[in-house]
């Protein structure tokens, strides 16, 4: 009876080990590594420079003095003054403002002018606007 008893105990332990191995092998596998996406940096807004660079030769902007001389004779609906506006053509408002600001500050236009008013007059005559926040100092 001893061998029958030991055989059944051995069978019991063998089956226990087998079932334990089967049950523990069905554990859920961990998820594969997924790298976190890098956050995109927010672009820094560029402030309006009061002293930027003019893509045109500021000396050529002397022809814009005619616009300031003739501004009191301007008729509404008349075409813009050609020599000055053709120099500013193709420039965005900020570039045109920087160019004229440089010319006015360097006294290229030949007069002591009120900066904001002169700048606004020439730009408006050529169909451009002074950018918000732009200061010609």
From Swiss-Prot:
The chain crosses the membrane at residues 88-104. Residues 1-25 form the signal peptide. Residues 30-53 are annotated as: Disordered. Disulfide bonds: none annotated. Induction: By the removal of auxins. Keywords: Membrane, Signal, Transmembrane, Transmembrane helix. The keyword Transmembrane helix applies. InterPro entries: Bifun_inhib/LTP/seed_sf, Bifunc_inhib/LTP/seed_store, Hydrophob_seed_dom, Plant_LTP/defense-related. The keyword Transmembrane helix applies. Residues 38-48 have a biased composition (Pro residues). It is a single-pass membrane protein. This is 14 kDa proline-rich protein DC2.15. It comes from Daucus carota.
């Amino acid at each position: 009876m001893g061998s029958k008893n030991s055989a059944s105990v051995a069978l019991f332990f063998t089956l226990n080990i087998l079932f334990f191995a089967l049950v523990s092998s069905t554990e859920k596998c961990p998820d594969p590594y997924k790298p976190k996406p890098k956050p995109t940096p927010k672009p820094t807004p560029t402030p309006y420079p009061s002293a930027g660079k003019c893509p045109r030769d500021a000396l050529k902007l002397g022809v814009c003095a005619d616009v300031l001389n003739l501004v009191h004779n301007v008729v509404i609906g008349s075409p813009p003054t050609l020599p000055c506006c053709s120099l500013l053509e193709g420039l965005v408002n900020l570039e045109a403002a920087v160019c004229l600001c440089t010319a006015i500050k360097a006294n290229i236009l030949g007069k002591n002018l009120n900066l904001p008013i002169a700048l606004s007059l020439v730009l408006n005559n050529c169909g451009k606007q002074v950018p918000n926040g732009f200061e010609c100092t």
